[in-house]
Amino acid sequence: LQKPLLIHDCGLCCAALKDAPGPYTKYFNFSVGTEGLLALMRDQEDRRAGWDDAIVYIDENGHAHSFSSLDRYGYTGEISETGPTKYLRFEGPERAIGRCFVPTSFGLTECLADVSEEDYQRYRREAPSVWNDFAAWYAARETETK
């Protein structure tokens, strides 16, 4: 692989499950699924959860610079106690566990699968993003090197 190199991964992290499934979210989707996650969380008082977007940029000198949304913003929501009821989105198994995430720090009280299209798009557009953090860092870095 040549440098510079940009690597990205994202996973759902549940505090009560020691940040699992984390990097195994895709596997977890197909092996455990929404109902399995809800079962694992059934008796948990700590329902905090968040999406951990992780970016690693390896510069031309081989130095790694990492950015993590979970480290920067913490848990931004929780796992619903009942799961989605309307399924307005996320019908396929590939995003199964994301269905039951409730972005409470963004002011929403329903699972992402159940919120209106307007609220979903607003969440996608306005929620804190590690990509914005990376872009700001990269722009500042480019300015410094000129």
Which residue stretches match the model-derived regions?
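Anionic-ligand binding patches
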Residues: 1-146
